[in-house]
Amino acid sequence: MADSSSDKEKKENNKQPVYRGVRMRSWGKWVSEIREPRKKSRIWLGTFPTAEMAMRAHDVAAMSIKGTSAILNFPELSKLLPRPVSLSPRDVRAAATKAALMDFDTTAFRSDTETSETTTSNKMSESSESNETVSFSSSSWSSVTSIEESTVSDDLDEIVKLPSLGTSLNESNEFVIFDSLEDLVYMPRWLSGTEEEVFTYNNNDSSLNYSSVFESWKHFP
């Protein structure tokens, strides 16, 4: 039993990887062919020195004949591979040969594709985080500005209290400042008049002439 299990393991280890539409000849070459739809006949695609070349030839033929339902060896190369002019075996074979001769490092191509996808995903994530940060900063700044304006307004209301203005001087209890004495004290005409003006005071039919009084004031220094 132990010998049989070890033989199976050896056979599994010696098995060649399975490629779609590709076979390895005994002398080390790789051949590729594809069955035509709804027919028993096959389209011979050619003999190639490497498995990758034969696989690309098969992928071109499969996409041409089966369309989007084709199962490919290198789906990542589907947009880069050529297409036949028609579905005739000759044109399909020509396109397959052209694809096989194209210089593709499949391993490197897959690595570059994965790296590009990872980089794009990271950039999108960073851009999203950056937009969220900018949005948060803008909202925070707006909130802080609003709070500061409200605080300043409250402080001004507490500090500056303007006196109330009444409709007249009698209704107001505030102080009133006059720019000159003339605004405060009423000056009689006889005090503000010239020396030619005479003020006469009548009391019980008696009259007083104050012209001499004004005349005497002229002698004072």
Curated annotation (Swiss-Prot):
Protein name as it appears in the record: Ethylene-responsive transcription factor ERF043
- SUPFAM superfamilies the record matches: DNA-binding domain
Superkingdom, taxonomy of origin: Eukaryota
Bias (Low complexity) ranges = 116-134
Q: Please provide the record's keywords in A-Z order.
A: Activator, DNA-binding, Ethylene signaling pathway, Nucleus, Transcription, Transcription regulation
Q: Which residues bind DNA?
A: 18-75
What the entry lists under Pfam families is as follows: AP2
Q: Which PROSITE patterns match?
A: AP2_ERF
Q: Which organism is it from?
A: Arabidopsis thaliana (Mouse-ear cress)
Cellular compartment(s): Nucleus
Name any GO cellular component annotation. Answer: nucleus
Sorted alphabetically, the Gene Ontology BP terms of this entry are: ethylene-activated signaling pathway
Give any GO molecular function from the UniProt entry.
DNA-binding transcription factor activity
Asked if the keyword DNA-binding belongs to this entry, the reply reads: yes
Function, as annotated, reads: Probably acts as a transcriptional activator. Binds to the GCC-box pathogenesis-related promoter element. May be involved in the regulation of gene expression by stress factors and by components of stress signal transduction pathways.
Q: Which SMART domains match?
A: AP2
Q: What is its main location?
A: nucleus
From the UniProt entry, list the residue stretches annotated as the region Disordered.
111-134
User: Which InterPro entries does the UniProt record give?
Assistant: AP2/ERF_dom, AP2/ERF_dom_sf, AP2/ERF_TF_ERF_subfamily, DNA-bd_dom_sf
Q: Which family does it belong to?
A: Belongs to the AP2/ERF transcription factor family. ERF subfamily.
